[in-house]
């Protein structure tokens, strides 16, 4: 009976996993068996999401992705890959985390990583930019993204802004923008042009760079109080007004512009997902490719009930939000489930909860010695971010083996049921050793 229940439960889980998108959503299910035929050998441009069913951010993306497929129907094809079911494609295209969105444009062998806002509108804009690029390539034209006399343009990387399209492209978009107001005769503008173009190329998919000829569009320049050239304004992510524009105060080399804009982009990224380590895949998703990985080991559910555990998890999420600019990975496991991990990081032996911060590239880690509280962890992570604190080599100098376990169901633990013993077969009158 228990075996039958397990089979039914497995069938339910598998059914739930495959229910992310249905044929009626317009999202094509892609697998290793049909990917080449559907995507690589097709002339159409594709937007492809690589996801894992257990990933919270993937689940949050579902309604926007369905909306995207509906909006792009007949223009751009939209597909999805369940990377948890088969890692072949995610490995082939270097997918390190979920969800990962790639746009397969004219050069199918070199898809573009999409790193912008996870909204249907923002993703659609990126996809349509690929359509425009492909059309211009076929026609042999450079397109209309030139920034005039400033020479700031390089293909589609620097976007030409005018009085007619400024509000629509900049203010009404969710993207981060840097806008250069220039004059064609300005020497400093001409010097900035190649640096601006180079920065735009490096920041593609993260921050949009535009250029507006202030001599041709004087009313727009006046609206933003432009008094000299070049003037660079920063427009934050999300819905914005003209009053939200800020002065750019960085340097004028490509590296300066990229560094300044990247800091703004990182500040706008969502908080990292706190991932439960239930198998090798979840462990890699949480920690692979991250500068550091914050690994917490929480008490067994019988020692710390659902309310207790959720309190710990809320603390970790709060701190993940605070340190999100570091782009660290965040993971947790129940004490005793991943013994090899605990042994390699020397945690758990002195009790739970415990924490270690790991640099898997250097195979070094540091253990939280203070209180597992918001203040205690904050102080520990602050020291780590400043390069302070004691570090030790990961035992064995290799990543620990991760075993597959069931994910926590969010409920209190249940003590194992004791089986009733039939005393009728036991002769209580005999003394036996």
Swiss-Prot record:
Residues 405-433 are annotated as: Disordered. Interacts with Drpr (via extracellular region). The lineage of its organism: Eukaryota, Metazoa, Ecdysozoa, Arthropoda, Hexapoda. Binds to both apoptotic cells and phagocytes and promotes Drpr-dependent phagocytosis of apoptotic cells. The keyword Glycoprotein applies. Glycans are attached at residue 279. PANTHER family: PROTEIN DISULFIDE-ISOMERASE A6. It comes from the Eukaryota. This is Protein disulfide-isomerase A6 homolog. GO terms for biological process: phagocytosis; positive regulation of apoptotic cell clearance; response to endoplasmic reticulum stress. A motif (Prevents secretion from ER) lies at residues 430-433. It comes from Drosophila melanogaster. GO terms for molecular function: protein disulfide isomerase activity; protein-disulfide reductase activity. It is an enzyme of class 5 (isomerase). Keywords: Disulfide bond, Endoplasmic reticulum, Glycoprotein, Isomerase, Phagocytosis, Redox-active center, Repeat, Signal. Disruption phenotype: Reduced levels of phagocytosis. Loss of both CaBP1 and Prtp does not cause a further decrease in the reduced level of phagocytosis seen in either CaBP1-lacking or Prtp-lacking embryos. InterPro entries: PDI_thioredoxin-like_dom, Thioredoxin-like_sf, Thioredoxin_CS, Thioredoxin_domain. Its EC number is 5.3.4.1.
């Amino acid at each position: 009976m228990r075996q039958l229940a397990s089979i039914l439960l497995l069938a339910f889980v598998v059914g739930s996993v495959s229910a992310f998108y249905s044929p009626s959503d317009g999202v094509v299910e892609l697998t290793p068996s049909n990917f080449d035929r559907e995507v690589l050998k097709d002339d159409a441009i594709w937007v492809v999401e690589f996801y894992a069913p257990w990933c919270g951010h993937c689940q949050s993306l579902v309604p926007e992705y369905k909306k995207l497929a509906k909006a792009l129907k007949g223009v751009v094809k939209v597909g999805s890959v369940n990377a948890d079911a088969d890692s072949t494609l995610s490995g082939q295209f270097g997918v390190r985390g979920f969800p990962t969105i790639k746009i397969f444009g004219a050069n199918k062998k070199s898809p573009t990583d999409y790193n912008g806002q996870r909204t249907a509108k923002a993703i659609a804009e990126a996809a349509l930019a690929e359509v425009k690029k492909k059309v211009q390539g076929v026609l042999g034209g450079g397109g209309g993204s030139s920034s005039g006399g400033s020479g700031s343009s390089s293909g589609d990387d620097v976007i030409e802004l005018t009085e007619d399209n400024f509000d629509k492209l900049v203010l009404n978009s969710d993207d981060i923008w840097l806008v250069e107001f220039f004059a064609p005769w300005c020497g400093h503008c001409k010097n900035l042009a190649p640096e601006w173009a180079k920065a735009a190329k490096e920041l593609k998919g993260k921050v949009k760079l535009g250029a507006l000829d202030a001599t041709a569009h004087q009313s727009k320049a006046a609206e933003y109080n432009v008094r000299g050239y070049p003037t660079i304004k920063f427009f934050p992510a999300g819905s914005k007004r003209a009053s939200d524009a800020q002065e750019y105060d960085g340097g004028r080399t490509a590296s300066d512009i990229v560094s300044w804009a990247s800091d703004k982009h990182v500040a706008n990224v969502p908080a990292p997902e706190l991932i439960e380590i239930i198998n090798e895949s979840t462990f890699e998703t949480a920690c692979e490719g991250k500068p550091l990985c914050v690994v917490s080991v929480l008490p067994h559910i019988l020692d710390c009930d659902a309310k207790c555990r959720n309190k710990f998890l809320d603390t970790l999420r709060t701190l993940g939000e605070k340190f999100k600019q570091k782009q660290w990975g965040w993971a947790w496991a129940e004490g005793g489930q991943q013994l090899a991990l605990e042994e390699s990081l020397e945690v758990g032996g002195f009790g739970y909860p415990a924490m270690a911060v790991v640099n898997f590239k250097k195979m070094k880690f540091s253990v939280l010695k203070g209180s597992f509280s918001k203040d205690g962890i904050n102080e520990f992570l602050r020291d780590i971010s400043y390069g302070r604190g004691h570090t030790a080599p990961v035992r064995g100098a290799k990543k620990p083996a991760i075993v597959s376990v069931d994910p926590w169901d969010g409920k209190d633990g249940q003590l194992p049921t004791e089986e009733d013993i039939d005393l009728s077969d036991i002769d209580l009158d005999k003394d036996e050793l």
